[in-house]
Amino acid sequence: MRKIQAKKGLSIECKGWEQEAVLRMLYNNLDPEVAERPEDLVVYGGIGKAARNWEAFEAIEKTLRELESDETMLVQSGKPVAVFKTHEEAPRVLISNSVLVPEWANWDHFNELDKKGLIMYGQMTAGSWIYIGSQGIVQGTYETFAELGNQHFNGDLAGTVTLTAGLGGMGGAQPLAITMNHGVAICVDVDETRVDKRIDTKYCDVKTADLDEALKLAEEAKERGEGLSIGLVGNAVDIHQAILEKGFKIDIITDQTSAHDPLNGYVPQGYSVEEAKVLREKDPKKYVELSQASMAKHVELMLEFQKRGAVAFDYGNNIRQVAFNNGVKNAFDFPGFVPAYIRPLFCEGKGQFRFAALSGDPKDIERADEEMRKLFPENEKLLRWLDLAEEKISYQGLPSRIAWLGYGERAKMGLALNRLVRDGEISAPIVIGRDHLDAGSVASPNRETESMKDGSDAVGDWAVLNALINTAAGGSWISFHHGGGVGMGYSLHAGMVVVADGSERAERRLERVLTTDPGMGVARHVDAGYDIAIQTAKEKGIHIPMIDKAGDK
């Protein structure tokens, strides 16, 4: 086992900045500031890994250092399997993680292959080497809670208490996103080290293991109308039950535990983290049974909060499905966050635009933020987000920024970053990518594609087409994964990264990729009949052959 740290500076060890960018982002994924369990190559999300094992990691490293600028490395579930001569505008790396034939696409078969060293779970950005820590999900979480506030609480979360659980790589964004919307958050996690990490990075304000203290702090902050986030150490089922018994009013209930993986991601009721680890190794079958039973209780308690007046929503971890499979027949009585709050953004091709400064110099991000403000002065949501991000976001690993941008905006910003690198206003190349959670890159019936207007929730073609078009457009590294976010059998999704190194070649590739990628989001929603998407496609001149057959009749 090695200790990996994000590499910074202007000298490179690969044969070009593009290959260097891949290597640096791989290292960044495993920097102790970023990864949850770097010693096990685990980045986030249960067992979301950056490489299959240390031997494969070192082979990836070596291959990247030797890779020519007209070659492409193929990575199969975290292991480099081939290098082929392609051309300079082709991707340097193509990645496929944990993709199983549908009949075998379940955790039992995956775990069997995993034990044999034949596969790896890549989550979304763990195995595609573009994770930037909790900031990567903060703006999406912020936008979700902002929209919830608009719909249910007169535009703001001031004077409300949100109860949630899970403070891992994804869930760790919740406390900050809620306080950014002026709400109070009680965030439960059984693993104290996760609470500590969120306190250290200033995503969470205070820590306690005492429920009464947490409720007192929450009530006081609520009465003052101030934002406050409380990391409460404990088991979610126990805590939720106790809060219901005390009759404490919860305004919003959700969950971001790693319920997508009942073996490695969720700790059953009645077990400490250490006890769970022992049982997991000794009797995995029993562990999964206990874990799923706890999840069923967990959802029943969420439904009870909903019955008592709380706004309830699923935050994309598949906990409703597990509960439904274990006898909770009304598990889907509360909606997922995408149909409830995010889909209108997807219809316009709006979604994640994240970038990292390969130099390691925070000044490069400051200059990029300044440029974003100049380019989009009319985008009030974006400007408000940048103000909050600059004030409250701590960098993990390489300095980075996340911003939600739409069709046309992404290409405009990408080209601007390339120009700033070319002119020396930014000191080294910038990596531009996104989460796989985006407008046109995912098929996930319990999350991103839940309740599609035309019933096409489970159609996986769109995620495949996204990977194909971004490869054709010349992304720097392109990935296709299975099971991210919601677990085996429940999702297919694609990722893209493109490097702005200041060159004319990069300019061509950036313009293509940052147009095709959000364009897929618009096309996917046009095909499903969403009028906002149809209007966007017509306004932006996106060529969709059968557009006149789409939409409401």
UniProtKB/Swiss-Prot annotation:
Q: How is the cofactor bound?
A: Binds 1 NAD(+) per subunit.
Any one GO CC term of this protein is: cytoplasm
Name its cellular compartments. Cytoplasm
Recorded hits in Gene3D superfamilies, A to Z, give: Urocanase like domains, Urocanase superfamily
Give binding positions for NAD(+).
45-46, 123, 169-171, 189, 194, 235-236, 256-260, 266-267, 315, 485
Q: Does the keyword Nucleotidyltransferase apply?
A: no
UniProt entry keywords in alphabetical sequence: Cytoplasm, Histidine metabolism, Lyase, NAD
Q: Which GO terms describe its biological process?
A: L-histidine catabolic process to glutamate and formamide; L-histidine catabolic process to glutamate and formate
Q: What does this protein do?
A: Catalyzes the conversion of urocanate to 4-imidazolone-5-propionate.
Identification of the protein by name = Urocanate hydratase
